Structure formats: structure tokens, C-alpha cells
């Protein structure tokens, strides 16, 4: 009994000694979470959401999107993903200077030479030196394109994805929602072939898949957009709920919207 009490006393003393450090972590974490810039949502559809929740698409389209307060770990995951995207894009730009089979193309210049009806480049938006902001007014789509490349004589949309080891090891082709996302890009840029570059964010292993956008995939995207637009015109939120426990539009408290 005496030994057990002595052990407990040591644990309490250790916790007390470390209290300033623990307090620092707590306060610093709160600062990270509360110092994020306010999110101003666009009323355009996002290609990354077209393969997902219809209710989310609807509320974003009418300008009433919900923004959950992001936890510090989700904030860090987003920041890490952005940094890896930019690092890989910079490597690709430099790779294009060394390998004659690879060319990094400028999206705005490509669209000048191969215009797509309804698609415009937002020249006022600058996130970094690699990504291009595009909008298509006919489809009401707005997005940042990771890159456009010519590899071995063929033009591809370059789509970069970072993911956990669990997801990385699970799939043998692009996920369906990623195919839908890339199809949106293809419809807006006029390119029907995609290279998906997946990177394991735990050990940075990479794998790539070539994906060809079919007419059937374009019809699926068009149908999803048209379905959502019908609800927008009626002013009625779709009562079609996704299975995600994280979706604020489909959780119990969000279903009354």
C-alpha cells in the first residue's frame, strides 16, 4: 500500500511540474483554432463535392453553407496537404526542364489556344505559382487545377492527392468521387485524360493512375448538377442524406435545414 501511495504521489508531482508546459499546449492549440481566417464560401459548385453529398452541394450553391469550427489536427492536415501539393508541383516544373518527355503546361495559355465554352480563368486569384483558378459559367463550376502536363506526347490533367496509409493501401484505382471531380475538370478544360498522383502522407510513397474520362462519366456529372439545380430553382433542400457522420447537413441536427 505504501509503495502504491508513493507511486501516486510521484505521478501527481510530475503532473504539477509539467503543468506550465501542458497549459502552453492548451492555449497554443486554442490560438491555432481561433486564428483561422473566416471562410467566405463561393456559390459555384466545387468539383470535389460533386461526387459527394447532394445537400452539401445545394446549401453551398444557395450561399448558406455551414462551416464547422475546424479542430487543430484538421487544420494541420490541410496545411500539410497544401505544402505537399506545392512541393510536388515545384518538382514537376523543374522535372519538365530536365526530361524532354514531360512538359508543365500553363492552363491559361492552353485555354487560349483550346477555348472551352463557358470556361474562364480568374486572373485576379493568385494562391501560388502553380495552380490556376477556373470557372465555368454554364456548369456553375469553380475550381483550382493542380496542373496540366504533357507526358510522352499526350496532354493530361494532373491531380494530386495526399492520403493516409490506410486509404493509400486500400485502392487499386482512383476513388469514384475523385473520378467525378476529375471529370468536372475535364469538362471545363477540354482534356479527357487524367494522371492521378497519390502520395502516402505517412511515408511519402507514391503511386499514379491514368484515367480516361468517358461520355458516361460526363453524363453522370451533368445529371448531378442538373438534379441539384432543380432543388435550387424550387428553393427546397433535397431530402437525400449521405452516410457521413461528419456531414453537418446530414447529421441529425442538420436535417431540419
Where are these regions (language model features)?
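A structural signal for short, well-ordered beta-strand segments and their strand-loop junctions
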Residues: 49, 156-159, 193-198
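Short, glycine/acidic-rich beta->alpha junctions
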Residues: 139-140, 174-179
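Short beta-strand-loop-alpha-helix junction that forms the active-site gateway
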Residues: 160-173
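Metal-dependent nuclease catalytic cores that hydrolyze phosphodiester bonds in DNA/RNA
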Residues: 1-157
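Short small-residue beta-strand/loop micro-motif enriched in glycine and branched aliphatics
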Residues: 68-70, 166-169, 206
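Metal-dependent nuclease catalytic regions and adjoining charged, substrate-binding loops involved
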Residues: 16, 170-175, 188-257
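Short, structured patches in soluble enzyme cores that scaffold and shape functional sites
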Residues: 149, 159-162, 198-200, 211
Amino acid at each position: 500500500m505504501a509503495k502504491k501511495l508513493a507511486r501516486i504521489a510521484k505521478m501527481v508531482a510530475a503532473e504539477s511540474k509539467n503543468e506550465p508546459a501542458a497549459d502552453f499546449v492548451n492555449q497554443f492549440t486554442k490560438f491555432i483554432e481561433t486564428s483561422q481566417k473566416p471562410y467566405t464560401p463561393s456559390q459555384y459548385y466545387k468539383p470535389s463535392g460533386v461526387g459527394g453529398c447532394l445537400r452539401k452541394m445545394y446549401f453551398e450553391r444557395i450561399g448558406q453553407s455551414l462551416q464547422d469550427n475546424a479542430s487543430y489536427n484538421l487544420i494541420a492536415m490541410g496545411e500539410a496537404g497544401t505544402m505537399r501539393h506545392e512541393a510536388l508541383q515545384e518538382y514537376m516544373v523543374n522535372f519538365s526542364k530536365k526530361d524532354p518527355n514531360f512538359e508543365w503546361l500553363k492552363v491559361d495559355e492552353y485555354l487560349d489556344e483550346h477555348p472551352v465554352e463557358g470556361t474562364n480563368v480568374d486572373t485576379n486569384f493568385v494562391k501560388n505559382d502553380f495552380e490556376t483558378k477556373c470557372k465555368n459559367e454554364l456548369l456553375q463550376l469553380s475550381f483550382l487545377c493542380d496542373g496540366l502536363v504533357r507526358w510522352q506526347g499526350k496532354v493530361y490533367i494532373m491531380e494530386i492527392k495526399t492520403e493516409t496509409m490506410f486509404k493509400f493501401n486500400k485502392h487499386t484505382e482512383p476513388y469514384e468521387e475523385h473520378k467525378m471531380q476529375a471529370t468536372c475538370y475535364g469538362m471545363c478544360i477540354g482534356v479527357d485524360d487524367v494522371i492521378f498522383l497519390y502520395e502516402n502522407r505517412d511515408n511519402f510513397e507514391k503511386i499514379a493512375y491514368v484515367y480516361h474520362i468517358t461520355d458516361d462519366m460526363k453524363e453522370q456529372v451533368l445529371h448531378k448538377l442538373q438534379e441539384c439545380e432543380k432543388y435550387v430553382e424550387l428553393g427546397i433542400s433535397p431530402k437525400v442524406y449521405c452516410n457521413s457522420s461528419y456531414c453537418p447537413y446530414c447529421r441529425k441536427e442538420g436535417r431540419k435545414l
